[in-house]
Amino acid sequence: MALPSAGEDVVRETKTPWWKGAQGEWYVVVQAVLMLLVLVGPRTLPGGPEWSLPYVPQRQMVGAILVAAGGAFFLAGLRRLGSALTPLPYPKEGASLVQTGPYSLVRHPLYSGGLFASFGCALMVSGWLTFVYVAALFVLLDIKSRQEERWLSQKFPEYAAYQRRVRKLVPFVY
């Protein structure tokens, strides 16, 4: 195997098996598990506290609005990303840096949309364990986005200016 020349994609060139996670595969697996838990996971632990929030129609409405808004933001991000879309955090070969549409509000609108929708689900089901899943998902996506941003910074010199200008996950906040 020849050594890659300057500018070549070293990770893809080495043909690392997917299960070693060289392109962030394990982030995607854990993310899928956490999102599945948010949707259909247990709401409390066996023998644990039976805590759940009392039914409040306003909380249900806020949850539904967050699910709809998060889903719409996610879909807008998918659409804007277009052919650069990949399930992995490693940037797709030949992709360009997208900074318009939802990407002008946050650097990771797919993650943001998923988080807002997940928090909305937690509000609607009111089980304490669902809030734990959402918190774990937030931590995972924050860590995943840091790795993704290292790769994006290597691929796109203009990414540093974009980072200074646009928040990571929550518009105008974080």
Please annotate each region the language model reported.
Residues 1-99, 116-174:
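Membrane-anchoring alpha-helices and their flanking helix-loop junctions
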